[in-house]
């Protein structure tokens, strides 16, 4: 058995810029998509990472009546740690949290994702940030209504 075959795997739910597989592969070159998943009770939002007005991005926003969508990736635990480091988890900019997703068969799937732990705002992301979100969303079979919701979230940011 090779070293890579023995490496521990993790799963990561991408709902923002990392929906774009090229963006995901930049940080996690071994990441493999497992499919579209949904997360009930949340929507995607944008926020500043604490008090720094220069740093902001996607975050989870509790929304009891909403279901959001994204892509679940399988990746080595080492690459998930690398993603955390690149995201500034150690500085408190983002936090890795455990969530429970639902697949297209209705089965519950545990996963990790990133969110901003102490969101501040407002944050208006530049097009260089939102374009990969939309490109990624359109590359997967996400519900058309959800893509419209993303467009509206971006427009209102």
State each model region's role:
Residues 2-157:
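Glycine-aromatic micro-motifs
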């Amino acid at each position: 058995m090779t070293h890579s075959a023995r490496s521990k795997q993790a799963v990561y739910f991408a709902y923002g810029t990392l929906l774009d597989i090229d963006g995901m592969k930049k940080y996690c070159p071994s990441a493999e998509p497992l499919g579209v998943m949904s997360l009930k009770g949340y929507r995607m939002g944008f926020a500043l990472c604490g008090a720094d007005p220069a740093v902001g991005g996607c975050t989870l926003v509790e929304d009891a009546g909403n279901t959001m969508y994204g892509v679940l990736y399988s990746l080595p635990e080492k690459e998930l740690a690398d993603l955390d480091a690149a995201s500034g988890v150690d500085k408190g900019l983002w936090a890795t949290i455990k969530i429970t997703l639902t697949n297209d068969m209705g089965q519950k799937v545990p996963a990790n994702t990133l969110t901003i732990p102490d969101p501040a705002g407002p944050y208006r992301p530049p097009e260089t940030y939102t374009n990969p979100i939309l490109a990624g969303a359109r590359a997967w079979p996400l519900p058309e209504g959800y893509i419209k919701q993303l467009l509206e979230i971006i427009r209102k940011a």
